[in-house]
Design a protein with these regions (language model features):
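AlphaC helix of the eukaryotic protein kinase fold
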Residues: 1-7
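Conserved short submotifs of the Hanks-type protein kinase catalytic core
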Residues: 24-38, 42
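Activation segment signature within eukaryotic-like protein kinase domains
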Residues: 57-58
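Activation-loop N-terminal segment of eukaryotic-like protein kinases
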Residues: 85-89
Length: 183
């Protein structure tokens, strides 16, 4: 995990690692302190966000995910549990414990890492191909929750019977193209 994060240096939207070492058969990672709130806690307290705020925050998350992907890394655990909101104009993505390289055999044969409501269908399957699209699914699920206040149903359930209502159907004031992108 530390080696994955260390590649990003002083990125403003990915947690910074200052040092990592192993001692007494235990791995230690020294990371920056982030003064803020987990997106998960924010959503539990506030329910949902105004569309303008949600779209701004998702843009910040997308930029962080683009940086992660630019290093050939699939995060595989993008969720509100792993995103800090440190101010209105800053987020931090962390927890790279499930990360895999996209072009490696590992990326093609990943173990299951499942975060209910945010995991793409391929994450539920044994020895499935996972790629950058795995993280993109998670980003869409986060945006859905930020706009509606509803955590999406499991992706595997949606494959069989999709009853998830779009943000527009739920009365969220967004453009139809944004609604289609989410769904």
């Amino acid at each position: 995990e530390a080696q994955s994060i260390a590649q990003f240096g002083k990125a403003k939207d990915i947690v910074n690692v200052y040092a990592f070492f192993e001692e007494n058969n235990t791995a230690y990672i020294i990371m920056e302190y982030i003064d803020g709130v987990l997106l998960k806690d924010y959503l539990e307290k506030q329910g949902k966000m105004e569309p303008k705020v949600a779209l701004h925050i998702i843009d910040l998350i997308i930029n962080a995910v683009k940086k992660i992907h630019s290093k050939g890394i699939i995060h595989r655990d993008i969720s509100p549990d792993n995103i800090f909101i440190s101010s209105e104009d800053a987020i931090k993505v962390f927890d790279f414990g499930a990360a895999q390289l996209n072009d490696s055999a590992e990326g093609k044969n990943c173990e299951k890492v499942i975060k209910v409501g945010y995991s793409a269908p391929e994450q539920y399957r044994d020895k499935s191909n996972q790629g950058f699209y795995t993280d993109i699914y998670s980003v869409g699920a986060i945006l859905y929750q930020m706009l509606t206040g509803i955590k999406p149903m499991e992706s595997t359930e949606r494959e069989h019977k999709d009853t998830l209502k779009s943000p527009l159907e739920l009365g969220v004031k967004i453009e139809p193209n944004v609604d289609r992108a989410i769904m």
